[in-house]
Amino acid sequence: KFIRHKDESFYECGQLIGYQQYCVNACQAHGSKEKGYCKGMAPFGLPGGCYCPKLPSNRVKMCFGALESKCA
């Protein structure tokens, strides 16, 4: 379950110093029950993002489509 961010640098998996900790904090803020981490999606031709295990389903829906900008 990915979370997105309006800041484009959010997608650059592995490019940012402290990115893993950023994902841990971001996933925790979204209500993930487990530690989040950065996950690349290059093989699928997609940008990477923070992968949050066991994210509440209502939060997941909020992070896609028209409400994508609401994710912080």
Curated annotation (Swiss-Prot):
MF terms (GO), sorted A to Z: sodium channel inhibitor activity; toxin activity
UniProt keyword Cell cycle present: no
Expressing tissues: Expressed by the venom gland.
Coiled-coil spans in chain: none
PROSITE patterns: LCN_CSAB (PS51863)
Disulfide bonding pattern of the chain: 13-38, 23-50, 27-52, 63-71
Domain comment (free text): Has the structural arrangement of an alpha-helix connected to antiparallel beta-sheets by disulfide bonds (CS-alpha/beta).
Name under which the protein is recorded: Phaiodotoxin-2
Origin species: Anuroctonus phaiodactylus
